[in-house]
Amino acid sequence: MKNGAFPHDNAAVPNVERVLPLFSLKGRTAIVSGAGAGIGLAVAQAFAEAGANVAIWYNSNKQAVTSAEDIAKTYGVKCKAYQVNVTSAEAVDKAITEIIKEFNGRLDVFVANSGITWTEGAFIDGSVESARNVMSVNVDGVMWCAKSAGAHFRRQKEEGTTIDGKPLDNFIAGSFIATASMSGSIVNVPQLQAVYNSSKAAVIHFCKSLAVEWTGFARVNTVSPGYIITEISNFVPPETKTLWKDKIVMGREGRVGELKGAYLYLASDASSYTTGLDMIVDGGYSLP
């Protein structure tokens, strides 16, 4: 932006007329953090099915290693698991650079999906350590991933080359997607989770701001799931889930597979004119 105006015609247009090819990720490289299970693993599977080579990051769930092998075998792409601490800017930057070198010299998509919940009830009764941990993983983790991924997106657009100096084919713009939450826009009941809610609100606004900063070389969007059946919510008692369903227009929790389309859309050229979007996928919970 200069003098309050964005550069005209700064975003390239895909040279594709038919709709299905727009969703292809063939030959591209994607990194998905928090992909040991749940939403992140489903997203990695979707990207691989669409033709992408995928690096999946995990924190402690070593099942990710086997999952990566299964993805590679099933979809005929390169897929490998990496243990990365997203709260460390240095670890994130090192991992991203090494993955780009190890894969095909490029980065096309980054999904910042790592996140943890708040389980200590009212904020004033919870521990300072837990609050800091939620913010460190949910907010700092997204920022450090964005900082490193964005630098690679910008270099690729400016230089038109892979990391080892070869011509970069079919790179229109990078796509950075962060997993936020409907909790970033509403206040959940009956559970009390002010820290978690505010962490996701921060992610949404951070990504909207990056969408402005990164115009010309990358698109930035968020996906805000509602109540989705994953391991992260196994601790929730059945009576609480019943109260959730009372407030969901569709009357049930979502499945991780029902989020695949949202992430694939935002990762692919199908969303070439979409940036700064917070896509809420919550079965209608936020409507009433």
From Swiss-Prot:
Family indicated by similarity: Belongs to the short-chain dehydrogenases/reductases (SDR) family.
Mutant lacking the gene: phenotype: Decreases strongly levels of growth on solid medium and biomass accumulation during liquid cultivation for both L-arabinose and L-arabitol; and impairs L-xylulose reductase activity.
Lineage: Eukaryota, Fungi, Dikarya, Ascomycota, Pezizomycotina
Transmembrane feature ranges: none
Active-site residue list: S181 (proton donor), Y196 (proton acceptor), K200 (lowers pka of active site tyr)
Keyword Hydrolase assigned: no
Binding site for NADP(+): I39, N113, K147, Y196, K200, I228, T230
GO annotation (BP), single: L-arabinose catabolic process to xylulose 5-phosphate
Top-rank taxon: Eukaryota
Keyword annotations of the record: Arabinose catabolism, Carbohydrate metabolism, NADP, Oxidoreductase
Pathway annotation from the record: Carbohydrate degradation; L-arabinose degradation via L-arabinitol; D-xylulose 5-phosphate from L-arabinose (fungal route): step 3/5
Protein's UniProt name: L-xylulose reductase
Induction of the gene: Transcription is repressed by D-glucose and induced by L-arabinose and L-arabitol.
Reactions it catalyzes: xylitol + NADP(+) = L-xylulose + NADPH + H(+)
Enzyme Commission code: 1.1.1.10
One term of GO molecular function: L-xylulose reductase (NADPH) activity
Known role: L-xylulose reductase involved in the catabolism of L-arabinose through an oxidoreductive pathway. Catalyzes the NADPH-dependent reduction of L-xylulose. Is also able to convert D-xylulose, D-ribulose, L-sorbose, and D-fructose to their corresponding polyols.
Signal peptide start and end residues: none
